[in-house]
């Protein structure tokens, strides 16, 4: 069990360091550096031990920094993946509809998603 935790911790540290090398916003980098320095292994593992999964209900999770949390970068990866699929499946005249609600960051994530679709030449309606 201790070996499993150590393996997860090392894997999580490596993923966190990879994120620090990406061109991400400074507030995300600050949070990652805090996670690495504060020694809270549980938080570091929870944030970075795996990639957020896309299930039948879409992406579900806790908002925060890391590959296993909901944030603009994990939303962006899922959106780019969906864009790639749509362009293969439909090839032209693709359009999407994005709805947001009153939940935390819902509007921001919707607008970020719309920008990614737009960059992929996918017509997007946001409401």
Q: Model regions: which residues?
A:
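An N-terminal, well-structured beta->alpha segment
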Residues: 9-113
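A structural preference for short, hydrophobic beta-strand core positions in alpha/beta folds
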Residues: 126-127
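Charged/polar low-complexity intrinsically disordered segments, enriched in acidic residues
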Residues: 2-5
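Short helix-loop-beta junction
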Residues: 111-123
């Amino acid at each position: 069990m201790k070996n499993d935790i150590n393996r997860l911790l090392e894997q999580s540290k490596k993923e966190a360091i990879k994120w620090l090398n990406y061109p991400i916003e400074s507030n995300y980098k600050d949070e990652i550096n805090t996670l690495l320095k504060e020694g809270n292994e549980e938080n570091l593992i929870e944030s970075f031990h795996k990639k957020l999964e896309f299930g039948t209900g879409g992406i579900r999770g806790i908002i925060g920094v890391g590959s296993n949390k909901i944030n603009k970068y994990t939303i962006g990866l899922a959106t780019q993946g969906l864009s790639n699929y749509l362009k293969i499946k439909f090839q032209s005249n693709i359009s999407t509809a994005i709805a947001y609600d009153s939940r935390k960051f819902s509007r921001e994530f919707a607008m970020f998603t719309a920008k990614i679709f737009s960059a992929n030449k996918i017509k997007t309606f946001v409401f």
